[in-house]
Amino acid sequence: MKVLALRHSVAQVYADTQVYVHDDTKDSYENAFLISNLTTHNILYLNYSIKTLEILNKSGIAAIALQSLEELFTLIRCNFTYDYELDIIYLHDYSYYTNNEIRTDQHWITKTNIEEYLLPGWKLTYVGYNGSETRGHYNFSFKCQNAATDDDLIIEYIYSEALDFQNFMLKKIKERMTTSLPIARLSNRVFRDKLFPSLLKEHKNVVNVGPRNESMFTFLNYPTIKQFSNGAYLVKDTIKLKQERWLGKRISQFDIGQYKNMLNVLTAIYYYYNLYKSKPIIYMIGSAPSYWIYDVRHYSDFFFETWDPLDTPYSSIHHKELFFINDVKKLKDNSILYIDIRTDRGNADWKKWRKTVEEQTINNLDIAYEYLRTGKAKVCCVKMTAMDLELPISAKLLHHPTTEIRSEFYLLLDTWDLTNIRRFIPKGVLYSFINNIITENVFIQQPFKVKVLNDSYIVALYALSNDFNNRSEVIKLINNQKQSLITVRINNTFKDEPKVGFKNIYDWTFLPTDFDTKEAIITSYDGCLGLFGLSISLASKPTGNNHLFILSGTDKYYKLDQFANHTSISRRSHQIRFSESATSYSGYIFRDLSNNNFNLIGTNIENSVSGHVYNALIYYRYNYSFDLKRWIYLHSIDKVDIEGGKYYELAPIELIYACRSAKEFATLQDDLTVLRYSNEIENYINTVYSITYADDPNYFIGIQFRNIPYKYDVKIPHLTFGVLHISDNMVPDVIDILKIMKNELFKMDITTSYTYMLSDGIYVANVSGVLSTYFKIYNVFYKNQITFGQSRMFIPHITLSFNNMRTVRIETTKLQIKSIYLRKIKGDTVFDMVE
């Protein structure tokens, strides 16, 4: 959903669009709630309130004030992520395909021969980080840039088995135009760029679990963040490999040698960060022209010093000369050395060239060892070739994708490796490594042990659901880690599957009730965005690839009206209510009937079931940004800070009734997941509320009327307005509450319209108009620890006879209250009051 705010209406008609005019009779919160539950994708919000826009954005719903038709046309035709704190729109707009154009935010790609392999008549355009170079295209009242690029497709091609780039891109662009992409995939980089700076302002130690190549630029500015990944491939791991020969396989049609060099250096940088938590100087020997340096320096300020007879235009200092082992003394501490020396074969005889390459490999290794031998805080990445070698067993082997699989690989060394045991590795084993292993990640840090880190803030995005983690340990971590943002895959199945297949792995599935967190917010991706100054124009779809975002230790936990709130809670029910049942009251009708309340007169007004809880349960797949458990808990401890909106405090029994309705809904739908979720939420309600039932009552509150429009043969027909189980010394407390509630009780608009047989031999009249007051007085009794009400639903009625009688229907008739009293069952009236 996107909310586009306008001061005046527009003449154009847009598809999937609704107009909402600000209602001045309601406050900003109520207007925001009503907008959020509209069913179309685009909302044109007229006569808008700035406060309402703020509320929507904090809820993760993109809402922005527009000043021109051009702004409207741009935003209505695509999705976007909105930084509502800095007033920046990041478009996810692929309409540039209509210019026969693909886009990249990686400069090195523009220096390759990729355009030879594009679709006929197409071109490649560089747009800068997150589309920063496109800002000049939009002369708007807010900052705007198009963050959409095709880098994800280009990188996917590089790691795929496909060789024909044109066919690959054609297929992927067609998929992009027809298949639902997770919106989080498009906006994740914007999110990470907001998330980590804000965390580092508040927390000294930040730990990040499971970073992937998509984040390889994001963390360059944060050397102190400790990364956990899948670990490195070590020299000692080659013992598992069988010997092989040279394979010679082309990976990419266009030259990706620069990409390989960039990944090697980035791997070395993050390895250095892990050891020393600071930025290094970067020395590079060979690898000219290294256009990728532009990309790295565009993201973060690094000092590069390079040696190569060829130009390296983006280096800080370039020496247009060869580098020899005697030059190592020129290199400073606190640095990285990247050695990428290899002579081109040219027309040389193969055997002669092979001998040269092996000599250069030994020379490269000597330079690396000499560099690491003295000084401190050093890491070296050196180019190697498959040959018989003695190597430190703890050295890291790298084989990032390059244009062709031939005989090269890279060795990552630190000063400790220099002193470690060396092992003879045959050439055939190294060929086996080259032929079969691709380094898929620039982050090669050790795996995360799933345990609490008391002195750190843990970020684990899309990293802990894998079934190689122990599920109970993941739950234990989330329950006990005081400060964290952790995601787990939500259980979107209908058969309550404990794990689901995803790509080539299995993931555990979770529901919010699997966790027993303390002061944690459990929400969706869009709900989480709102907590960090972002909102998005499209909520996550229930694809099966959805995650719960669990934030522990946030200072926003008690801000119930601002973050992870109840906006959009009824949107799904509004979208489907006109399908088979063809009535806007279908949800109300089902909820009442499923709790054996058959009086449906005024069912949309007299609610006996919490609609919030009911919708949050049965449609949790469509809106889990609303943190239901937090909402229940804060109500149970009376710490709900209501900032606005139409607020009605629910009695705990109304929450229970909602769970029962949801369970019946789940049974009818054969939805085992909703069934379990509803049961567990009901158990949770019973845990946080101390609900007691007057199923064996000894007192009741009665209401006597001046007029009863039916025949009756009981002595005094009355409405039993609830039963109590109390000791005699609690009677004064009950009387005090009745006195406090007197005005509200006598103001009830009570009506009746028919009679019916409640059961065999019990003839009653229906009563409408009392439920809201009943639940209010229930809450007052509950807070005073007085047992009021039974476990079954309260069905208001007046007993007319203890004989079977014919039912009667009359015009709706108002009942005038004569008196309200408290009486002991099978005893005397102990209190009576009149208006």
From Swiss-Prot:
<feature type="region of interest" description="2'-5'-phosphodiesterase activity">
    <location>
        <begin position="693"/>
        <end position="835"/>
    </location>
</feature>
<feature type="region of interest" description="N7-methyltransferase activity">
    <location>
        <begin position="171"/>
        <end position="245"/>
    </location>
</feature>
<feature type="active site" description="For 2'-5'-phosphodiesterase activity">
    <location>
        <position position="720"/>
    </location>
</feature>
<keyword id="KW-0378">Hydrolase</keyword>
<keyword id="KW-0506">mRNA capping</keyword>
<feature type="active site" description="For 2'-5'-phosphodiesterase activity">
    <location>
        <position position="797"/>
    </location>
</feature>
<comment type="function">
    <text>Counteracts the host innate immune response thanks to its phosphodiesterase that degrades the 5'-triphosphorylated, 2'-5' linked adenylate oligomers produced by the host cell IFN-inducible 2',5'-oligoadenylate synthetase (OAS). The host RNaseL is therefore not activated.</text>
</comment>
<feature type="region of interest" description="N7-methyltransferase activity">
    <location>
        <begin position="429"/>
        <end position="555"/>
    </location>
</feature>
<dbReference type="Pfam" id="PF05213">
    <property type="entry name" value="Corona_NS2A"/>
</dbReference>
<comment type="subunit">
    <text>Interacts with VP1. Interacts with VP2.</text>
</comment>
<dbReference type="GO" id="GO:0008081">
    <property type="term" value="F:phosphoric diester hydrolase activity"/>
</dbReference>
<keyword id="KW-0489">Methyltransferase</keyword>
<keyword id="KW-0899">Viral immunoevasion</keyword>
<dbReference type="GO" id="GO:0052170">
    <property type="term" value="P:symbiont-mediated suppression of host innate immune response"/>
</dbReference>
<feature type="region of interest" description="2'-O-methyltransferase activity">
    <location>
        <begin position="246"/>
        <end position="428"/>
    </location>
</feature>
<keyword id="KW-0946">Virion</keyword>
<dbReference type="GO" id="GO:0003723">
    <property type="term" value="F:RNA binding"/>
</dbReference>
<keyword id="KW-0547">Nucleotide-binding</keyword>
<feature type="active site" description="For 2'-5'-phosphodiesterase activity">
    <location>
        <position position="799"/>
    </location>
</feature>
<comment type="function">
    <text>Multifunctional enzyme involved in mRNA capping. Catalyzes the formation of the 5' cap structure on the viral plus-strand transcripts. Specifically binds to GTP and displays guanylyltransferase and methyltransferase activities. Has affinity for ssRNA but not for dsRNA. Capping activity is non-specific and caps RNAs that initiate with either a G or an A residue. Together with VP1 polymerase, forms a VP1-VP3 complex positioned near the channels situated at each of the five-fold vertices of the core.</text>
</comment>
<keyword id="KW-1090">Inhibition of host innate immune response by virus</keyword>
<keyword id="KW-0949">S-adenosyl-L-methionine</keyword>
<keyword id="KW-0511">Multifunctional enzyme</keyword>
<keyword id="KW-0507">mRNA processing</keyword>
<dbReference type="GO" id="GO:0016032">
    <property type="term" value="P:viral process"/>
</dbReference>
<dbReference type="GO" id="GO:0005525">
    <property type="term" value="F:GTP binding"/>
</dbReference>
<protein>
    <recommendedName>
        <fullName>Protein VP3</fullName>
        <ecNumber>3.1.4.-</ecNumber>
        <ecNumber>2.7.7.50</ecNumber>
        <ecNumber>2.1.1.56</ecNumber>
    </recommendedName>
</protein>
<dbReference type="InterPro" id="IPR039573">
    <property type="entry name" value="NS2A-like"/>
</dbReference>
<dbReference type="GO" id="GO:0019013">
    <property type="term" value="C:viral nucleocapsid"/>
</dbReference>
<keyword id="KW-0548">Nucleotidyltransferase</keyword>
<dbReference type="GO" id="GO:0004484">
    <property type="term" value="F:mRNA guanylyltransferase activity"/>
</dbReference>
<dbReference type="GO" id="GO:0004482">
    <property type="term" value="F:mRNA 5'-cap (guanine-N7-)-methyltransferase activity"/>
</dbReference>
<feature type="region of interest" description="GTase/RTPase activity">
    <location>
        <begin position="556"/>
        <end position="693"/>
    </location>
</feature>
<keyword id="KW-0945">Host-virus interaction</keyword>
<dbReference type="InterPro" id="IPR011181">
    <property type="entry name" value="VP3_Rotav"/>
</dbReference>
<keyword id="KW-0808">Transferase</keyword>
<feature type="active site" description="For 2'-5'-phosphodiesterase activity">
    <location>
        <position position="718"/>
    </location>
</feature>
<comment type="similarity">
    <text>Belongs to the rotavirus VP3 family.</text>
</comment>
<dbReference type="Pfam" id="PF06929">
    <property type="entry name" value="Rotavirus_VP3"/>
</dbReference>
<keyword id="KW-0342">GTP-binding</keyword>
<dbReference type="GO" id="GO:0106005">
    <property type="term" value="P:RNA 5'-cap (guanine-N7)-methylation"/>
</dbReference>
<keyword id="KW-0694">RNA-binding</keyword>
